[in-house]
Amino acid sequence: MKKKVNIYLFSSLLLISFSNIFCQENTRIQIDSAGFFEKDDIKFTNATILTRNNKNKVKISHDGVDMWCNQAFFYEKKNYIEAYGDVILRQGDTINLNSQYLEYDGDTKIAFASGKVKLTEPNSILLTDSLYFNRNKQEAFYNNYGRVIKEKQDTIDSKIGNYLLENKKYEFKINVLLKNPKYKINTPRLDFYTENGHAYFYGPTQIKSKESNIYCELGYYNTNNDTGYFIKESKVDFNNTTILADSIYFDRNLNFASASNNIKIIDTINENITKGNYAEIFKNKDSMFITKRAIIASKQNNDSLYIHSDTILITGNEQNRVIRAFKNAKIFKQDLSGRADSIHYDKSNGLAQFININKQLDLSFTNSKKPILFNFNNQITGDTIVLKFEKTTNKIDSLLVFNNAFILEKDSLGTGFNQISGKSLQGKFNDNELRSIDIIKNAES
């Protein structure tokens, strides 16, 4: 008896399941209203011709959508309709599809619209010549160019587009162009979320504006607040400054960028190249800092001046540029090298300062970090060393050493050394070579 009950219950459930499937697959298109009904089996076999009157359009409904048009051909056996003239398809209270022509299959729930197609949702408008709308998948698709308008200022053009209604996401492919009054984005593929304005691009992409040009092959841009994050072959051009890095964060409103890993910053105005592994660039303030194996190379006539340290801070415009190198700073030049805890170079007065670390630290550690310079056969040390460069030629003009000045010089025979010490030291250069020295107070040799 128990087996019979189970079999009966299973059979009933199976019958109900098949009934549900059958009902779902055969939901019929409903004709809600029309001005005129007619049949013409000679011209339109098996079709009912529905036409509007002076007051109202033809109204049709099917499983959650309502349709209006001037005229419709209804194929009841096929559960299929063709609509003509000022067609409107409305799904819920958020999706409106306008066109001049519409085909709709009640069994597959697939619609095809053509002629001045306009798809409207709360955050965007899609314009195209023809569009497929799959209600089962809740996807709309075009393949013959379309334009999406967002908030009356952003437009996105592409040859192919796919809109996922549930995710509020567009997928654009081939010749994609996003236009904004401030910038343009050209890319082969772009995913765009209408609700939050986030754009994700794939492949060679350019973002152009008056203030900057950006290139990457994988990235993201927030069209609502004008910030972006770019990876893979990332490059940002700020007029005369080019930033290359593995990844770059960008804020258009602040004219700010931060970069990470394998950074190279080219400054064509000041003729220098800066490298490191993390940097922040404040273009409006003409400033930046770079850290993690930071190095800056500045062109000086036929030579280059290199400054290397843990962190480098650069501020000021071309005439007032200041370079500050912190912690384990080193300087290299064809005829000069040196190191200190910190190096401070001011282009406006041509002074480069080699600064000792805090004197309150352990004496042995302090002495090991004392500034030191090498120039041809000379080695110079002191608590603080100041080099003065000629501003026009960038040649070294003079030298000042404050406190515990010491100079070691190889003698003219090359067999020994001369050494001089004192409280302070002054030196003069000729063709970048130290030629004369004056010791101030407590001179010893």
Which sequence ranges carry the predicted segments?
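N-terminal amphipathic/hydrophobic interface segments
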Residues: 22-445
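Bacterial Sec-dependent N-terminal signal peptides
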Residues: 1-27
